């Protein structure tokens, strides 16, 4: 999420909480919880729901803390992230590492105890994908960092599904694919209006390496692909008319933003598109949940 220097140092607890990127963690956990409910025609057992939610949230927070640790010098050079306690030097490297280790350990134990080993190992693999492969290797090396690294960020629905069933079937991977394709246009609109930040930090984001026009075109192309991919839950029979209607309406507005960015770009427009992309994903997954339980009632 976009955050500016209006943040001020707070209590020690709030500083540690900031390391977990709470709003990003909340979205990831939300998608995981939707995956849990879609995995069963009835209700999710409360122990699995509670344990899966807490465990996935803890490991996500642990991964984000490692990200803050690795990127503290980069964050200090960027207006969007300079407020973070790691960038300000308010928390030491050892403290961040210890905090991340505790969160990760508790998260893994919670998942193993209240869900199943598959969920634990998949979530640990997601942690490695984000904290190590994306943060350490992909992000500083290639403008395709978001495309390739998006795989780890797309996993929450599969983690939730696995928590309930102990398996990851095709329908779960459709949900993963939706987030995977959503990730590039979501981050590229941010990179467009924060281009100077990334350029100053030496990060090879697409607008920095290939220019604004190239990035605008790829935002449009990926949004078109995203619109098509979001039809898959209906085509596969996983979802019905409630979801389809929502996906078409939400996707049409996302496409409108992408088209406007391509044809008549402004930083203000990119900011609105970035914020909408978060609302879009949240409402899309909410529509999946509503459809899942409404479909047997309305028969559509």
Curated annotation (Swiss-Prot):
Positions of transmembrane segments: 24-44, 48-68, 94-114, 118-138, 146-166, 172-192, 217-237, 239-259, 278-298
Q: What is its main location?
A: membrane
Q: Biological process GO annotation list?
A: heme O biosynthetic process
- Functional pathway: Porphyrin-containing compound metabolism; heme O biosynthesis; heme O from protoheme: step 1/1
A GO cellular component annotated for this chain's UniProt record is: plasma membrane
Q: What reaction(s) does this enzyme catalyze?
A: heme b + (2E,6E)-farnesyl diphosphate + H2O = Fe(II)-heme o + diphosphate
This protein's membrane topology, according to the annotation, is: Multi-pass membrane protein
- A Pfam family matched by this chain, by name? UbiA
Q: Which PROSITE patterns match?
A: UBIA
Tell me the compartments it is located in: Cell inner membrane
Which keywords describe this protein according to UniProt?
A: Cell inner membrane, Cell membrane, Heme biosynthesis, Membrane, Transferase, Transmembrane, Transmembrane helix
EC number(s) given by UniProt: 2.5.1.141
Q: Which InterPro entries match?
A: Protohaem_IX_farnesylTrfase, UbiA_prenyltransferase, UbiA_prenylTrfase_CS, UbiA_sf
GO terms assigned for molecular function: protoheme IX farnesyltransferase activity
Its family remark reads: Belongs to the UbiA prenyltransferase family. Protoheme IX farnesyltransferase subfamily.
Q: What other comment is given for this protein? A: Carbon 2 of the heme B porphyrin ring is defined according to the Fischer nomenclature.
Physiological role: Converts heme B (protoheme IX) to heme O by substitution of the vinyl group on carbon 2 of heme B porphyrin ring with a hydroxyethyl farnesyl side group.
Protein name (Swiss-Prot/TrEMBL): Protoheme IX farnesyltransferase
Species per Swiss-Prot/TrEMBL record:
Burkholderia pseudomallei (strain K96243)
């Amino acid at each position: 999420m976009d955050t500016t220097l209006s943040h001020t140092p707070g209590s020690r607890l709030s500083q540690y909480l900031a390391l977990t990127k709470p709003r990003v963690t909340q979205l990831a956990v939300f998608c995981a919880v939707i995956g849990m409910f879609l995995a069963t025609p009835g209700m999710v057992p409360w122990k699995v729901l509670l344990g899966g939610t807490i465990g996935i949230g803890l490991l996500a927070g642990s991964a984000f803390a490692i990200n803050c640790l690795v990127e503290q010098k980069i964050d200090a050079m960027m207006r969007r992230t300079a407020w973070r306690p790691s960038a300000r030097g308010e928390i030491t490297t050892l403290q961040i590492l210890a905090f991340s280790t505790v969160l990760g350990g508790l998260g893994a134990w919670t998942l193993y105890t209240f869900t199943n080993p598959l969920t634990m190992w998949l979530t640990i693999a997601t942690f490695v994908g984000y904290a190590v492969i994306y943060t350490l290797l992909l992000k500083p090396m290639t403008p395709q960092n978001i495309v390739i690294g998006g795989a780890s960020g797309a996993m929450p629905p599969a983690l939730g599904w696995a928590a309930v069933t102990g398996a990851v079937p095709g329908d779960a991977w459709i949900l993963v694919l939706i987030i995977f394709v959503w990730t590039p246009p979501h981050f590229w609109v941010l990179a467009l209006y924060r281009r100077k930040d990334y350029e100053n930090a030496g990060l090879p984001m697409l607008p920095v390496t290939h220019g604004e026009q190239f990035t605008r075109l790829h935002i449009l192309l990926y949004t078109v692909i995203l619109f098509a991919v979001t039809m898959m839950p209906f085509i596969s029979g996983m979802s019905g008319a409630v979801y389809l209607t929502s996906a078409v309406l939400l996707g049409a507005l996302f496409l409108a933003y992408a088209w406007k960015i391509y044809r008549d770009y402004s930083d203000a427009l990119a900011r609105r598109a970035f914020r909408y992309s978060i609302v879009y994903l949240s409402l899309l997954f909410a529509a999946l949940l509503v459809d899942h339980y409404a479909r047997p009632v309305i028969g559509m």
